[in-house]
Design a protein with these regions (language model features):
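Membrane-embedded alpha-helical bundles that constitute the cytochrome b-like, heme-associated redox core
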Residues: 1-189
Length: 189
């Protein structure tokens, strides 16, 4: 708990993170999401007004590549919930209506535990939402990681298999770590 609180306090008090990195991250997420919609619209426009007579999406593209907009939308909804759960209370308790508990050492860990120990079934529903969102994040990353390299022209017989393999591991390990954190805080109250 102490390490978690120290890192969280560092991030909430560090002007570099709060006033430079956080806005850049927000702009990047919004840009990424908007470009996802733009790309989807361009793809639909390129197909024309007539639908395919017979469409076999699996013939040329994986399920993940065909459903990036779906997984991205689930992730965006989750991000809004996550901001509501953590960012809004932190900003409120730190800047808007200062809470004396904020200066105490366990504020962040206590708040994290609170989110997953809400009224009975609500905390279980919250846990399920987090897990489902992280599964969608895994699917989104599995396609998006290698696809990002291909989009910037980094496609080569020698390097692409390494990028794809790294992307698969990355897309499993990062969301799995987030799932472990959520499950841990649900069961360790």
């Amino acid at each position: 708990p102490n390490g978690f609180n120290e890192v969280s306090a560092f991030m909430s008090d560090n002007p570099f993170i709060q006033y430079l990195m956080q806005p850049i991250l927000l702009i990047g997420v919004v840009y990424h999401f908007v470009m996802g919609f733009v790309l989807e619209a361009q793809n639909k426009k390129a197909r024309g007004p007539v639908a395919y007579q017979k469409y076999n999406g699996a013939a040329n593209a994986s399920w993940m590549s065909r459903n990036m907009l779906v997984s991205g939308s689930v992730i965006l909804i989750f991000l809004l919930l996550h901001l509501y759960d953590f960012w809004v209370p932190t900003i409120t308790d730190h800047y808007i209506a200062p809470n004396p508990e904020f200066a105490q050492g366990n504020y962040f860990m206590d708040h994290l535990n609170h989110v997953f120990t809400l009224e009975g079934a609500l905390s279980f529903v919250r846990l399920v939402i987090y897990i489902v969102a992280f599964v969608f994040l895994s699917l989104h990353l599995q396609h998006g990681f290698a696809s990002a390299f291909q989009s910037i022209g980094a496609r080569h017989n020698k390097y692409t298999p390494v990028i794809v393999a790294f992307g698969k591991w990355y897309s499993i390990l990062i969301p799995a770590g987030f799932i472990i954190i959520a499950v841990y805080h649900f069961f360790v109250k």
